[in-house]
Amino acid sequence: MKTILNRTPLMALLLQIATLAANAQSITAPEPCGPTPNVNQLALQNMEEYAFLHYSLNTYTDMEWGYGNENPAVFNPTKLDVRQWVRTCKAAGMKGIILTAKHHCGFCLWPSEYTEYSIKNSPWKNGKGDIVGDLAKACHEYGLKFAVYLSPWDRNHAGYGKPEYVTYFRNQLRELLTNYGDIFEVWFDGANGGNGYYGGTNETRMIDRTTYYQWPETYRMIRQLQPKAVIWNDGGERGDLRWVGTEAGNVGETNWSLLNKTGDVPWEQLHYGLENGNAWVPGETNTSIRPGWFYHKSEDDHVKSLSKLMDTYYKSVGRNSTLLLNFPIDRDGLINPIDSARGIAFARMVEQVFSNNLAQRAKVSASNVRGNSRTYSAANVIDKSMQTYWAADDGVTKATLTIRFNKPTRFNRFMAQEFIQLGQRVSKFSLKALVGSKWVSLKDELVDNGDGLTTIGRKRIICFPTIKATQLKFIIEDSKKCPLISNIGVYLAPELSMDIPNSGEKFASKFNVTIVGSNDVPGKSILVDMEQSKMVSGFRYLPPQNTRNGIITHYSLWTSENGNDWTKVCSGEFPNVVNNPIWQNLTFKATKARFIRLDGEQISEGDRVLYSDIDVNINK
């Protein structure tokens, strides 16, 4: 008698396996959402932090913008060491370096064959040096990427403003792109046109920065010669990156990596991006570790504190932007020891804060998982990979990730990253922590009223007072399409002391300060009445901090003992003051005066000068 096997359970199991396999095959990957980054943009955004190095004749003339007639003989550093620059930048957490190969004065840090206004006519190395080449080699040696800043504006060149200068400009750009290896970024400054030396004419030349340089042709040359480079351009044709509208070191708490391909870009779009833009143009936050971009000994006591640098990090990298942090080269040809120590301390603090992700020892679940597939499970957000992500089903634009700690846990930082290879999606989210038996809403303490839990992008970091909780809910309240979250992090950052203002400064609150003018030009001057005559030798002007209106860009300074008879002390330009509204310092031979008047010969916008503070240096 034959034994008849019961195959029903086996067949059921095989059918179940086949069904699961079929379901797995039917779960498609999410479609892209709007514009997405190209390979170069993605690589740049993944760098997060890289250094700016400002170095030129300005270093030795104590200026921010050279006029173009400065003597190359002043350029003779005694301790110049590009390897020290690179070691410092690497220790400060920077992944690359951008050098000001030529600033507005026109002086070149490489021996360009197209001009005599370069280091080949300086005493340094008897004119045989090449700082661009030396730095490119040092970056390669230490594993950092290298890039160049080339100012389109050249206040030295006789042909600036004429068609022949564009050829000169491209010839110099070609030298930089073909002689120094791979370039990760080409940086074109937005300052274009104005007064200058211009071969000895000493005149003002204005250009249309959108058309004069013929940017499309220049871009084609860059793409051909350096196909891995991104282009930063605040002066014309849309580049691969955008300026964020300020040099103070912050971008908007809402920050879309999108703009339109063409058209004007108002300040709001620079700072916040454009939610429905048709081009991927991420923000790059550029700021200096000192008030100015070039080295000034007077700023040795004004290097950004550790707490200020961390604030800058949270408001740039932590808001879906890269951070381009400037280290000015000092007169010895080195990154100053003060700047170096502060930059390295900054890197160590970032490492300390983000080295221990508390979420990786917790359990994470999601309210929705795409197709219930392990490929898109919530566990992906704590696997330390940028190539995996949690995804929700199509049509789901609200979802929650819940982090359950194995014991009450103290934390004060939350980090999230979208899988931006498929676009930027999330437009609003919230955080709630289970403290005891109560759910508590967490607010961003770096934003007024805690608002601003909106966009995420490449990385978003939220700071809040330390709490002790057993669960944390990351609630996505709105998303353009199904949300894709690559990583989340929960951290406990140490407390940092707040900045303490410098002591001993004599501020304008001690004086009578009024805005005055004439019948023809009302409100053009700032008048300081010290109530009695004093010996003065300096004047400081702090522009308005929350508006671009009323900023004095060109000035004259006058003194008087009686308020009727005035003597001009000095006049000139406050370079780059609109973009970087820091203290503007004027020093002069000690003179006796009761009244000081700062005239706004030109102001940025509006018809009335404005100020945040005034300081007078009174001789004792």
Predicted regions and their residues:
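Compositionally biased low-complexity segments at domain edges in trafficked proteins
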Residues: 507-511
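Bacterial N-terminal signal peptides that target proteins for export
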Residues: 1-10
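Sec/Tat signal peptide C-region and signal peptidase I cleavage site
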Residues: 20-24
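Mature catalytic domains of secreted/periplasmic carbohydrate-active enzymes
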Residues: 25-397, 402-403, 408-410, 415-417, ...
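Bacterial N-terminal signal peptides
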Residues: 11-19
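Aromatic, loop-rich ligand-recognition surfaces of beta-strand-rich domains
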Residues: 338, 345, 350-353, 383-443, ...
